[in-house]
Amino acid sequence: EAGEECDCGSPANPCCDAATCKLRPGAQCADGLCCDQCRFMKKGTVCRVARGDWNDDTCTGQSADCPRNGLYG
């Protein structure tokens, strides 16, 4: 929702302040395939293994999202 940086539905998430729905100090992310322990995973980290003739999808190092590269192997 507007103004939220993270999903504050679960107080168990160590990256997100459940009271404010904001990332905790020092956290870059709270969830996502490219988020590990509140930090963006390194560029090139495989976040989705290829199926068929597609190449693996990899993290950008700048986001918690795992973008589809759309490239054939």
Curated annotation (Swiss-Prot):
* Molecular functions (GO terms): toxin activity
The free-text tissue note of the record is: Expressed by the venom gland.
Q: What are the disulfide bonds?
A: C6-C21, C8-C16, C15-C38, C29-C35, C34-C59, C47-C66
Domain (Disintegrin) ranges: 1-73
Superkingdom field? Eukaryota
- Which GO CC terms are listed, alphabetically? extracellular region; plasma membrane
Placement of sequence motif Cell attachment site = 51-53
Cite the entry's keywords alphabetically.
Cell adhesion impairing toxin, Disulfide bond, Hemostasis impairing toxin, Platelet aggregation inhibiting toxin, Secreted, Toxin
Give the matching Pfam families: Disintegrin (PF00200)
Cellular localisation: Secreted
Keyword Disulfide bond attached: yes
| Record has Disulfide bond as a keyword | yes
Q: What does this protein do?
A: Inhibits fibrinogen interaction with platelets. Acts by binding to alpha-IIb/beta-3 (ITGA2B/ITGB3) on the platelet surface and inhibits aggregation induced by ADP, thrombin, platelet-activating factor and collagen.
| Quaternary structure and partners | Monomer (disintegrin).
Mind telling me what this protein is named?
A: Disintegrin tergeminin
The organism named in the record is Sistrurus tergeminus (Western massasauga)
Q: What is the lineage of its organism?
A: Eukaryota, Metazoa, Chordata, Craniata, Vertebrata
